[in-house]
Amino acid sequence: KTQVSAIHNQLGEDVGISVEPCRRDTFPAIALATAYLVDVMHVAPSESVVVCPVDPYVEDGYFEALKELSEQADKCEANLVLMGIEPTYPSEKYGYIIPESTDHVAEVRTFREKPTADVAEQYIAQGALWNGGVFAYKLGYVMDKAHELMDFTDYQDLFDKYDTMKKISFDYAVAEHESKIQVVRFAGMWKDLGTWNTLTEAMDESIIGKGELNDKCSGVHIINEMDVPVLAMGLHDVVI
């Protein structure tokens, strides 16, 4: 809810926004958003959409890759089309997608949960890709899955009883049970900034915008989008 005003400021007041009444993990959230598009915005069930997290640090090519995912979903060769990020090291933080081939677009053989570094090296040797939680589908597909797995009639009904829905991820509820699933490789820059540590590691400078640190500060980062400067004094390990 705290992001609604910022989204309207950036994209305009006419942008449709559906806000979760409470947290219920990614499957109910995606089902709610899908029902909003179909039942409220009256988007055709045959339309393809892309779901992506908001916190990765990416290059412009990433957004072209999102378009490619949607176009691949339009072909109806698979019910789900995932983005597989080319691994740059054997990470223990991400799940892995094991494809059937090293083609740019390939069928998915299986998924693997977050492994140890040694096991991750084995996955990468098999051509595995990071699962960044980015995928495309036709609206009707997820609407059917939502009605199959949850008891609701339409968007408003789902919204009203949302707090009673089981907490479950989209991967567990849908992706890992789907046989018609493809992955599209992405080799561009992609870094998950889901924590303050990873955000500050990606910053080339400790201050973005107008700000000053005195000599008593250590481990302090300032991100200031306002014209009013920020002065930090005697702070340690803080993001402002």
Where in this protein do the model-derived segments appear?
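Conserved core of the sugar-phosphate nucleotidyltransferase
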Residues: 59-162, 182
